């Protein structure tokens, strides 16, 4: 507001100044245009001015008489009296003549001054009449005609000058064409002897000569025709180049003799500036030679470049084929290991016989996880060391089981104690976050539906699952020799990379962790089943480190739904477990160890994104194992295809968001685009591969 008032005050002050003056100020240029003649005319227009002029003349004349002693007073007085007495008329005439002479001289001076000013005014008037095209008296018209004739002569001279300039340009263009022709002749002459020599030299050593010519700076033009020669041997020159070569050859035949002499003449002309009188040295003549030299050698250089590009392309193709072969070999090895793991996993089915409970828990877990993940934020990082300690304890439990069958009972007790502790922790965590009743109702409905479906399929799977165990035991020792990685180091590195990927991996483990709770509340005969599940859990925890608080909350939410459905499956499981006996326990221990080792090998080879996919494969492989072995093989083949497709897409996703984020970063700082609406797309793009995996699980069921 202050600026506006200041501007208003400034405008008012200017108007006040104008009003005080009372008249619009005139530019000083108009005042200066008044001439001396105008001033004289204005002064002498009035009679008072003339009286003043006469008075001035008389006074200054009297002053002059007195100053210079123009009058002899003695003679004047004596003679005047005598003259007057003798001849008074003579005196009067003499006096009048003298005064008239004085007056005439004075007026002549004034007339001269006025005439000079009048001439200047006449010149100004002539200019004005030229502008306005007003009719003048005949004398002035003659002068104007003369001026117009002079003006007409000037454009004629200009036209003549233009014609001469065009002629000069034509001469220059002719000279340029001659220069081009001579330059083409040069190149053709050089190419002709080289064609003869190349016919012989190509057989001996093409590569050595090319290297020598490239090293020598002065023979660069010779290298270009050699490349052109090689192109002709390959029969791939374009038709336009062949036509140009024919034309230049025809010109070269006519002017072979004068070639070098003319070139020397041109070089001397350009270097020393010995130009013809018609040429203007202002225009630099060396340019045409450069332009003429470009078109002809361009073709061999292009041909040489194309050759090099073809060679490079062939090398790239060979290198890419080698890389593809290596990658295929790696993929085959990965597939073999995956097949071994998936074949070993069905051995769990006859030992545990809890396919229904697992499928129920996993189906409920998937729905709850999708709802809860949207609500939950990142859990604190302090909970990671707890998960590590629990995993280490369970690792020590596994070798004890494998070495001695007798100590299986105390190890089972330890696993029970651990699971009970985990349940207590989950109950404490779940009290903080209340679960809505609608979710529980949905999960119970899905649990009941899936139990009904899988009751019918249980009886047929029992006999089929026992047969493949013998073959799998033979493959176990080989896998033990092959796989000896360091799992904890790789896991620590992966945790440091991203917490978001750990969240993704937490889901599959939660699916497997839930069946343990259901068994822990069951009968004492299910201790063997619990031991097998503990080993499975330990193997999976080695591969995937989730956040325990999340897991606890999932377990607490899903535990009431699973408890209601317990009595149906456990009645069938108990007789089947007693039949298997101690042999199954040994097999399960070996299988769990080898599975853990195979998974660690895969984790080291594959990226962090692949890790989540493999953890899903564990849960997927357990489900079809309870249906049939043939279904398992079909599902495993489909999984491999999905894994490969997702691996390729994951690598692309890892690369593309980085470049995209860099572009956004630059635009944001330059101010050409909004930084905030665009950058969030980076996170969903990165995690877009994860939501598809639960859908794949449901398809597997």
UniProtKB/Swiss-Prot annotation:
The chain crosses the membrane at residues 48-68. Its main location: membrane. Residues 69-701 are lumenal. The keyword Cell wall biogenesis/degradation does not apply. Residues 1-47 are cytoplasmic. Residues 131-256, 303-351, 365-385, 391-426, 437-485, 492-643 have a biased composition (Basic and acidic residues). Residues 684-701 have a biased composition (Low complexity). Keywords: Disulfide bond, Glycoprotein, Membrane, Phosphoprotein, Sarcoplasmic reticulum, Transmembrane, Transmembrane helix. Phosphorylated by CaMK2. Signal peptide: none annotated. Residues 117-130 have a biased composition (Acidic residues). Glycans are attached at residues 75, 617. One of its GO terms (cellular component) is sarcoplasmic reticulum. One of its GO terms (molecular function) is protein-macromolecule adaptor activity. Changing residue 75 to A: Loss of glycosylation site. The keyword Disulfide bond applies. One of its GO terms (biological process) is positive regulation of cell communication by electrical coupling involved in cardiac conduction. It is found in: Sarcoplasmic reticulum membrane. Residues 1-28, 117-256, 273-654, 676-701 are annotated as: Disordered. Residues 8-24 have a biased composition (Polar residues). Contributes to the regulation of lumenal Ca2+ release via the sarcoplasmic reticulum calcium release channels RYR1 and RYR2, a key step in triggering skeletal and heart muscle contraction. Required for normal organization of the triad junction, where T-tubules and the sarcoplasmic reticulum terminal cisternae are in close contact. Required for normal skeletal muscle strength. Plays a role in excitation-contraction coupling in the heart and in regulating the rate of heart beats. This is Triadin. It comes from Canis lupus familiaris. The gene is TRDN.
């Amino acid at each position: 507001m202050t600026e506006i008032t200041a501007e208003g005050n400034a405008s008012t002050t200017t108007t006040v100044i104008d009003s005080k003056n009372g008249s619009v100020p005139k530019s000083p240029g108009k005042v200066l245009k008044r001439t001396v003649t105008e001033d004289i005319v204005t002064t002498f227009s009035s009679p008072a001015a003339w009286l003043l002029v006469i008075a001035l003349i008389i006074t200054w004349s009297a002053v002059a008489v007195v100053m210079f002693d123009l009058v002899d007073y003695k003679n004047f007085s004596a003679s005047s009296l005598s003259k007057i007495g003798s001849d008074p008329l003579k005196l009067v005439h003499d006096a009048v003549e003298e005064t008239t002479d004085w007056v005439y001289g004075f007026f002549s001076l004034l007339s001269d001054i006025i005439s000079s000013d009048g001439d200047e005014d006449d010149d100004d008037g002539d200019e004005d009449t030229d502008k306005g095209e007003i009719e003048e008296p005949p004398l002035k018209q003659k002068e104007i005609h003369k001026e117009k004739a002079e003006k007409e002569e000037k454009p004629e001279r200009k036209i003549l000058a233009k014609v001469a300039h065009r002629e000069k340009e034509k001469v220059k263009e002719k000279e340029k064409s001659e220069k081009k022709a001579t330059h083409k002749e040069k190149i053709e002459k050089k190419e002709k002897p080289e064609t003869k020599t190349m016919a012989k030299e190509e057989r001996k050593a093409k590569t050595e000569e090319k290297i020598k010519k490239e090293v020598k700076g002065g023979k660069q033009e010779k290298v270009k025709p050699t490349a052109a020669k090689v192109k002709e041997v390959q029969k791939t020159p374009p038709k336009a180049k062949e036509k140009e070569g024919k034309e230049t050859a025809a010109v070269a035949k006519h002017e072979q003799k004068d070639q070098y002499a003319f070139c020397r003449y041109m070089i001397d002309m350009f270097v020393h500036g010995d130009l013809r009188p018609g040429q203007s040295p202002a225009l630099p003549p060396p340019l045409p030679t450069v332009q003429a030299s470009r078109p002809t050698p361009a073709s061999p250089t292009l041909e040489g470049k194309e050759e090099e590009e073809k060679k490079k392309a062939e090398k790239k193709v060979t290198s890419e084929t080698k890389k593809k072969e290596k990658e295929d070999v790696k993929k085959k090895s990965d597939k073999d290991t995956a097949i071994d793991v998936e074949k070993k996993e069905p051995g769990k089915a006859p030992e545990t016989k809890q396919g229904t409970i697992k499928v129920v828990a996993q189906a409920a877990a998937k729905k709850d996880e999708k709802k809860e993940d949207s609500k939950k934020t990142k859990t604190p990082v302090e909970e990671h060391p707890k998960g590590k300690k629990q995993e280490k304890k369970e690792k020590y439990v596994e070798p004890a089981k494998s070495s001695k069958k007798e100590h299986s009972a105390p190890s089972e007790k330890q696993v029970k104690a651990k699971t009970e502790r985990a349940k207590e922790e989950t109950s404490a965590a779940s009290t903080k976050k209340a679960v809505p009743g609608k979710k529980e109702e949905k999960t119970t409905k899905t649990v009941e539906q899936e139990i009904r479906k899988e009751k019918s399929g249980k009886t047929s799977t029992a006999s089929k699952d026992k047969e493949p165990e013998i073959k799998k035991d033979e493959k176990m020792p080989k896998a033990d020799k092959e796989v000896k990685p360091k799992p904890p180091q790789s896991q620590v590195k992966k945790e440091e990379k991203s917490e978001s990927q750990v969240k993704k991996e937490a889901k599959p483990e939660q699916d497997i962790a839930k069946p343990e709770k259901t068994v822990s509340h069951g009968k004492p005969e299910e201790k063997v089943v619990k031991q097998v599940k503990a080993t499975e859990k330990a193997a999976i925890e080695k591969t995937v480190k989730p956040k325990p608080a999340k897991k606890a909350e999932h377990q607490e939410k899903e535990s009431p739904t699973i408890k209601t459905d317990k009595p149906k499956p456990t009645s069938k499981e108990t007789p089947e477990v007693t039949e298997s006996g101690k042999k199954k326990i040994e097999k399960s221990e070996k299988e769990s160890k080898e599975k853990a080792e195979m998974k660690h090998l895969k984790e080291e080879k594959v990226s962090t994104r692949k890790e989540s996919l493999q953890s899903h494969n564990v849960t997927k492989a357990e489900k079809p194992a309870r249906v049939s072995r043939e279904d398992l093989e079909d599902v495993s083949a489909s999984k491999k295809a999905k894994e490969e497709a997702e691996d390729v897409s994951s690598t692309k996703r890892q690369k593309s968001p980085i470049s995209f984020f860099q572009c956004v970063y630059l635009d944001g700082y330059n101010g050409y685009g909004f930084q905030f609406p665009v950058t969030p797309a980076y996170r969903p793009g990165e995690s877009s591969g994860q939501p598809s995996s639960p859908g794949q699980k449901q398809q597997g069921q």
